[in-house]
């Protein structure tokens, strides 16, 4: 009976490190796609949106003037496309 208890103890003691190693490698595999996507979609300084002196489409035009091709809506105070009915 003693041998049976010892063999069960050794088996369980051997399985615990195996489970720990498997869990650690699985968690690394789960982190790998996240790291890859974050490196692919990382914002580079060259591609950051530049601050303009004018407001673009559907932007507030209270303080800034609208860019060429847009007019400031008197009702909403947004830069919109000029149209005949907006006078």
Swiss-Prot record:
Expressed by the venom gland. It is found in: Secreted. Disulfide bonds join 54-67, 61-72, 66-79. The keyword Disulfide bond applies. Pfam families: Toxin_12. This is U3-theraphotoxin-Hhn1a 13. Belongs to the neurotoxin 10 (Hwtx-1) family. 51 (Hntx-8) subfamily. Hntx-8 sub-subfamily. Keywords: Disulfide bond, Ion channel impairing toxin, Knottin, Secreted, Signal, Toxin. One of its GO terms (molecular function) is toxin activity. Residues 1-24 form the signal peptide. It comes from the Eukaryota. One of its GO terms (cellular component) is extracellular region. Ion channel inhibitor. The presence of a 'disulfide through disulfide knot' structurally defines this protein as a knottin. Residues 25-52 form a propeptide.
């Amino acid at each position: 009976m003693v041998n049976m208890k010892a063999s069960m103890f050794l088996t369980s003691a051997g399985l615990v490190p195996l489970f720990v190693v498997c869990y650690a490698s699985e968690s690394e595999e789960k982190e790998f796609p996240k790291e890859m996507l974050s490196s692919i979609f990382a914002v580079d300084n060259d591609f950051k949106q530049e601050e303009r002196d004018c407001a673009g489409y559907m932007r507030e035009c209270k303080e800034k003037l609208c860019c060429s091709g847009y007019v400031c809506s008197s009702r909403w105070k947004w830069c919109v496309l000029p149209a005949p009915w907006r006078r």
